[in-house]
C-alpha cells in the first residue's frame, strides 16, 4: 500500500489509520460470523451489541450523566436545525440564537420556519472575527432554549467558554469540536454533532439530550423527527445508519486507547499552537480571528497574494497534504486538524508553508 496522505478536509474528514485497518480486517467477516457488519440485521444480537458498546464508550469518554439519552440518528446536523425547534420550541414560544457564522445562521434561518427567533448576539458586529461576550447578549427571560454553534468550521471561530443560561436549556451544535477535549455535559440541555468530522463517517448525527426535554414535540412533528420516538426505540425506530454507527464505535474505542479526551486535548493543543505560531510569525500568512476565539479544529489562513493560492495547493497536494482549499464563501486556505490527524501532519504542513514562503515571499 502506498503511503497515506495527510487529509485536512473539513468533512468528511480523516479517520484514524487504526480504525480503517480494523474495519478493513472485519469487512468481509465480522469476528468469524461469515458476514459484514453492513449485511447484519440491526435487530440481531450481534449488531445490538455493537450499537450498545458504541453508546457506552461515548458515555465513558464524555462522562455523560445517566439522565441523558444518547441518540444515533440520520440526517446529519443540518436536519437538527429543524428537528430542534420541532421538539423544543412551542408555537407561542421564543428561542434565542447566537450568530457566529455560516452554520449558526443556517440554524437561525431554519428555526424561523417554526417559530419566533431572537438573535441574542451576533459576531457580525466584529466582522465574524470575534465572539461577543455574554455581557453583550440580549437573552429572552423565558426562552424555550438558547442555541449556539461551539465551533464554526468555515470561519474558524470557537467558543472557549460555555454560556450561562440559568434554567433555560442550552443547545449546541458541536459537530466539529466534540471529543476534542473534556466537556461538562451537564451544562447542556442538548448537544448534537454530525459524525463526519470528529466522530466517524458521514450519514450519522449524535444527539445527547436531557431526558426532561423529551416529550415536548409539537403535534405536527413527524414521528421520525421526534426525539422521544428515537429514545424509546434505542435509535432503531427504523433501520439506522448501521455501518456509520459501527465505525463511530471503533473511533470511540480508539479514543479510549489513546487516553480519552484529556489526551486529545493535549494533542490538539500542540497541533493548533504549532500552526498558529507559524502563521503569526510570518508576514506571508495571516489569520484574522481574535486569538481567544480561534478554533482548535479549523484553521483558516490566507497567503499574501491570492494569485499564489493555486500553486500553493498544487505543491501541497504533490506532498500529500490534501484538502487545504478554504471554503468557497471565504477563500484562502483552511487546515482542519481533527482528532484523527497527529502532530506529524501539522509538522509536515508548517514545513511546507515555510518552504513555500521562502520561494515566493
UniProtKB/Swiss-Prot annotation:
Organism for this UniProt entry: Pseudomonas aeruginosa (strain ATCC 15692 / DSM 22644 / CIP 104116 / JCM 14847 / LMG 12228 / 1C / PRS 101 / PAO1)
GO cellular component: cytoplasm
Residues the record lists as N6-(pyridoxal phosphate)lysine modifications: 197
Pathway this chain belongs to: Amino-acid biosynthesis; L-serine biosynthesis; L-serine from 3-phospho-D-glycerate: step 2/3; Cofactor biosynthesis; pyridoxine 5'-phosphate biosynthesis; pyridoxine 5'-phosphate from D-erythrose 4-phosphate: step 3/5
UniProt key word rRNA processing: no
CDD domains tied to this protein: PSAT_like
A single GO BP: pyridoxine biosynthetic process
Protein name: Phosphoserine aminotransferase
Signal peptide from the UniProt entry: none
Function: Catalyzes the reversible conversion of 3-phosphohydroxypyruvate to phosphoserine and of 3-hydroxy-2-oxo-4-phosphonooxybutanoate to phosphohydroxythreonine.
A molecular-function term among this protein's GO annotations: pyridoxal phosphate binding
HAMAP family: SerC_aminotrans_5
Subcellular location: Cytoplasm
Assembly, per entry: Homodimer.
Chief site of localization: cytoplasm
Residue positions binding pyridoxal 5'-phosphate: 77-78, 103, 153, 173, 196, 238-239
Record-stated family: Belongs to the class-V pyridoxal-phosphate-dependent aminotransferase family. SerC subfamily.
EC number: 2.6.1.52
Keywords: Amino-acid biosynthesis, Aminotransferase, Cytoplasm, Pyridoxal phosphate, Pyridoxine biosynthesis, Serine biosynthesis, Transferase
Pfam families noted in UniProt: Aminotran_5 (PF00266)
Cofactor(s) needed: pyridoxal 5'-phosphate
Binding note for cofactor: Binds 1 pyridoxal phosphate per subunit.
Catalytic reaction list: O-phospho-L-serine + 2-oxoglutarate = 3-phosphooxypyruvate + L-glutamate; 4-(phosphooxy)-L-threonine + 2-oxoglutarate = (R)-3-hydroxy-2-oxo-4-phosphooxybutanoate + L-glutamate
Binding site for L-glutamate: 43
